[in-house]
Amino acid sequence: MSPWLPMSFLAAEDDSFYQHHGVDPVAIVRAFIYNLRNKASGGGQQGGSTITQQIIKQLLLSSERSYTRKMKEAILAYRLEHTVSKDDILQTYLNYIYLGQHSYGVEAAARTYFGKHASDITLAESAVIAGLPQAPSRYNPFRHPEAAKARQMYVLGRLRTLKWITEEQYQQAINEPLVYWSMPENRGGASKWYFEEARRLLVEFFTEENLRTLGIDTLKSGEEYVYTAGLTVRTAMDPVQQDAAGAALRRGLEELDKRQGWRGPVKKLSPAEVTEFREKSTFAPADLMGKAWVQAVVTAVDAKGARVLLGKGYTGYIPVANMSWARTPNRKISGWGAPAVRDARKVLNVNDLIMVSAAPVTVQAEGGKKGKAATKTVDFDPATASPQKPITLLLQQEPLVQGALASVETQSGDVVALIGGYQFGDSHFNRATQARRQPGSSFKPVVYSTALDFGFTPTSSVLDGPFVYVNPYTNEVWRPGNYEKNFRGIMPLYEALTLSRNTCTVRLAHKVGISNVIQRAKMLGLEPHFPQELSISLGAVAVSPLNLTQAYAAFANQGLGVRPRIITSITDNNGRELYRQDIQHWQAHTPQNAYQMATLLKNVVNSGTGSRARVDGHVIAGKTGTSNDENDAWFVGFSPSLVTGVYVGFDQLQSLGKQEQGGRTAAPIFRYYRSQIEDLYNDQPGITMQDGLAFQGVPGPGLSAIDNASEDPATGSSTPTAPDTSGGGEDLMRQMF
């Protein structure tokens, strides 16, 4: 860390640290007199605790204010001073002290307040951070910059009084501009979702009861214990996959948001605010690296595009082609193929504050045919930027729609990636684990898996036609229909799943019994309370994205269910293991059932509603899902080693827009993620055939009707019988794939 940090903390908190033995009587008397003088006037209070006492208070004792606690604090501080070196005590203090904004330790504080590592902190910045322990909220530089500056001046004054810095260093520090900002999301932002989920699980685990069971004698519990106990926590997160998942979800949500239309600028600036933007902007071309977004102010607009001010003399230009998506929102019109904007004046106005990113650049490449130069597209290079030449930009807009992505290794249950929303800084609500939404058709594999155990086969006949169900208890009538609002008649079971036909699924659930479907759902590990309602066969039950993703693992892993693992182990600061989650399997259904389901779900991706989830060169199986009124879009897909679930929807229930189904909205996000990480797994190009199964001859691909289905006139369900094999012994799997 920067040498200014320990020096600043010592000046602010305990300048005689290297002279006392854990307790400083002089400091206690000084604080008592200071507080007595300020009590009547309501002024600030001063603490007399040494750094050693503060460590004892934070790591071992509760935060109660009492003479008994202060006495314990003093005794333990004295003992600590005689067993641990001064340097180690100071190092521990700097690594564990709470500094506001969920930041513990100087490294976290440096990242939070100045967007840099502790090793890069200046004297002026060190004084700001060192001023925080007394009242992290009151001196928070984001919320109270004036108070933070005053506290910084106090710390710098102490350094000067102690002659630890020169007058020149003091003057330079007090005049140094302070720019407060946190490390942006694209630098470690995706991991915050995972770490916050792990933190939440830790707080839930370390209850007073569990601490007693573990034999831990402490007055702290929950969050207070987690932050101060010096725990070593191992998680199942794969940083490469976590970053890929975050980028994939952000890309998919931004694409959906653009299909929904332009909601307007961030703000309409007054002339005075434009002047302030121009003067205070800290823009540098490097800010646009990695497809990052920055703010800009529109300075001129015509039909062909808009000129914008970026700051520090740099300008940009947004051609109308780079804002062609920015139509007026209209949920009744599909964003797929909507008319493009052709006049920039219909989108932007002068003094609009907007978000922009650098447009890709077309450059010459090697090769070319028939005398034509070859070109390629590359990312913006800040080294090419100049104040004399506008930077070509893209108009951007932060999505309102949210989503989640969870990825689980099928054999271990390791949750290798977990993204809970578009941007962690906007909301810490983790939609992957905390949201409960209806999965729609992505629940259907539970029904089909049940049907396979009740005598149905992939070639069994099922009717896609009108279905009427009267609830015997309420007399309510339910008439489910298909998304396309049509019926296709009798079809084989595998085609009904491939095309996600609702009436076929309901008939299957009615035939095998909804209680058996619920039993299968629970065996797969699904956690909701399931009402005995036929509608749950179409996903009319709320479930979390991680829970649904985990349920699909059995289809990829020979019928073995697996418990998800986020935290794999916890050890204390003495190396004692406090918790370990071993791999936990159970037989959710037979390996034969799993093989058939995996094969059926491959067909959904190869030629059905999940075609946008295909990853070139890799075998993917999965199922799309869309809830009523296109409120929620899902895709859950897997290979033999990894299952990934994607959910997209608004936090407040509303339609995603016309034609925004799981196959169009969620499946591409799956592909963006899996195309980046698929090579990490050495999966074979197929799913292993299980004993007890045999390929069965069926009619060829031109199958138009099956005559061997008998329909129950009371229920409308079809009864499977042996399929007609007169069409020849074609291999079913070859027909499907």
Features from the language model and the residues they span:
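Active-site loop and adjoining helix of the penicillin-binding protein/serine DD-peptidase-beta-lactamase fold
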Residues: A77, E81, P133-R151, T161, ...
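Conserved catalytic neighborhood of penicillin-recognizing serine enzymes
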Residues: Y34-R65, S119, P184-A190, Y194, ...
